[in-house]
Amino acid sequence: MEEFVDVAIEAAKKAGEIIRHGFYKSKHIEHKGVVDLVTETDKACEVLIFNHLKQCFPSHKFIGEETTAAASGNFELTDEPTWIVDPLDGTTNFVHGFPFVCVSIGLTIEKKPVVGVVYNPIIDELFTAIYGRGAFLNGKSIRVSSESQLVKALVATEVGTNRDKAIVDATTGRINRVIFKVRSLRMSGSCALNLCGVACGRLDLFYEIEFGGPWDVAAGALIVIEAGGLVLDPSGSEFDLTARRVAATNAHLKDAFINALNESE
């Protein structure tokens, strides 16, 4: 496993150089949807990451936001070792010069995350995890918060890029109900960094429904779990990497948080 995480870190840092180089420059922007953006940096980073990983692990499978999945509109997650990559999570932040952007690289074996690497090159924060061996921020062990009162919890969520009225109404309605039960709410614009925020205790809770795909959570979910947290479906059922639904919490807040989310449905 050490070889896997070392190679993933190398790839993330190389992609991070591209992101850092382009962060303060003008960008060529394309639209995947009305507000769903992609830049030449997203594409260049994914090519770099996949080339680096394929050189080291040619027999592995690969799923990426910008090429593998976006080109066909679907993907297949098998039991084979599979690298799941978001080359630039937080593209809208990148376009606006808002420094919550990251490279997210996860490895699954038998459909379970076993390696997670999330790197924010703008503030030089590297989150890593190997299954069963803990989670780390820049090499130092991290743990989820010990907060036990929902009313004191800081929660993160996102509104996503889907502008279908029914989905937007459901999202905002959920926020309107949850906000009265917690201390405050944040939206960073990056699913992967929200998960890492829970892992290191900056955030107590995170949930998101209808995010882009497994590339948003493959690395971050493992990092939360290895930091002592729980990753679930917002309904309280088992987390499904491919379902585009996630909730992250510590053990103390789990029941109250899941109840609050279910009451909001």
Swiss-Prot record:
Record's keyword annotation contains Repeat: no
Residues annotated as binding Mg(2+) 2: 86, 89, 216
Q: Does the keyword Metal-binding apply?
A: yes
Tissue-by-tissue expression: Low expression in roots, stems, leaves, flowers and young and mature green fruits. Expressed in the stem/leaf junctions, below the shoot apex and on the abaxial side of the petiole of the first expanded leaflets.
One BP term from GO: phosphatidylinositol phosphate biosynthetic process
Cofactor list: Mg(2+)
Instruction: Read off the InterPro entries from this record.
Output: IMPase (IPR033942), Inositol_monoP_metal-BS (IPR020583), Inositol_monoPase_Li-sen (IPR020552), Inositol_monophosphatase-like (IPR000760), Inositol_monophosphatase_CS (IPR020550)
Q: Which UniProt keywords apply?
A: Hydrolase, Lithium, Magnesium, Metal-binding
Which gene underlies this protein? IMP2
Q: What is this protein called?
A: Inositol monophosphatase 2
Query: What chemistry does it catalyse, as a reaction equation?
Result: a myo-inositol phosphate + H2O = myo-inositol + phosphate
